[in-house]
């Protein structure tokens, strides 16, 4: 049986169950010919599912609400981590000092932008600060590259990926994660 699986992101450690299954021949042993498709855009899998071009897609639970369609259903999670927004140290200082903040994200729309803003505003309230000068810019998937290029923060970051990558790149960061501001975790696939 041929199964096409569209990812939400480029292949990375989040996708280990699929990578290991292919590497160990587990799918072939069960007569499954799995094709993994890396997207150009974060929502490509939803479009391909809706058009019946693929059988499965991965994406974060919040996008299932955002991109709801009658012919698409969630069959479960295979992965969960902490996550939220990662700031450069300078970006975080700008945030608490009320300066303009530019945040890179793979998507920018009213739903995801509101969640990012909620994280920031809840954090600022806890430390008795305010800042409404926040701009979210849609870019590609490479958060750490954008932080190193001058963005103040990156949104929709996962600890197991961008959290680790920032350490490996020697980038000093301040993390504002969902759990820090009492928002239920949705950093899962």
Specify the residue positions occupied by each region the protein language model found.
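Pocket-lining segment of extracytoplasmic ligand-binding domains
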Residues: 61, 142-143, 151-189
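Short, glycine-/small- and polar/acidic-enriched structural segments
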Residues: 2-138, 148, 153-160, 175-176
């Amino acid at each position: 049986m041929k199964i096409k699986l569209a990812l939400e992101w480029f292949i990375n450690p989040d996708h280990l169950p699929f990578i290991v299954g292919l590497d160990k021949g587990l799918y072939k042993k069960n007569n499954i010919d799995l094709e993994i498709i890396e997207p150009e855009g974060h929502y490509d899998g939803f479009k391909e599912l809706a058009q019946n071009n693929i059988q499965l897609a991965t994406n974060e639970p919040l996008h299932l609400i955002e991109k709801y369609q009658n012919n698409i259903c969630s069959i479960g999670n295979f992965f969960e981590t902490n996550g939220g927004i990662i700031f450069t140290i300078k970006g975080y200082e700008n945030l608490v000092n009320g300066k303009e903040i530019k945040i890179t994200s793979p998507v920018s729309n009213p739903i995801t932008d509101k969640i990012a803003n909620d994280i920031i505003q809840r954090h600022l309230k806890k430390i008795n600060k305010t800042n409404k000068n926040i701009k979210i810019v849609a870019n590609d998937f490479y958060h750490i590259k954008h932080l190193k290029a001058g963005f103040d923060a990156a949104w929709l970051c996962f600890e197991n990926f961008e959290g680790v990558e920032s350490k490996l790149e020697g980038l000093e960061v301040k993390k504002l994660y969902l759990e820090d501001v009492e928002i239920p975790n949705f950093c899962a696939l």
